[in-house]
Curated annotation (Swiss-Prot):
Pfam families (alphabetical): Fer4_2
Protein name: Ferredoxin
Molecular function in Gene Ontology: 4 iron, 4 sulfur cluster binding; metal ion binding; oxidoreductase activity
Encoding gene per record: fdxA
Domain 4Fe-4S ferredoxin-type: start-end pairs: 2-21
Organism of provenance: Pyrococcus woesei
Length: 21
């Protein structure tokens, strides 16, 4: 899976919000 490290995208979960449940 592609985990893109983005300050705007990655909040709270440690991974990007797109990959967050």
């Amino acid at each position: 899976m592609k985990v893109k490290v983005d300050a705007d995208a990655c909040i709270g979960c440690g991974v990007c919000v797109e990959l967050c449940p």
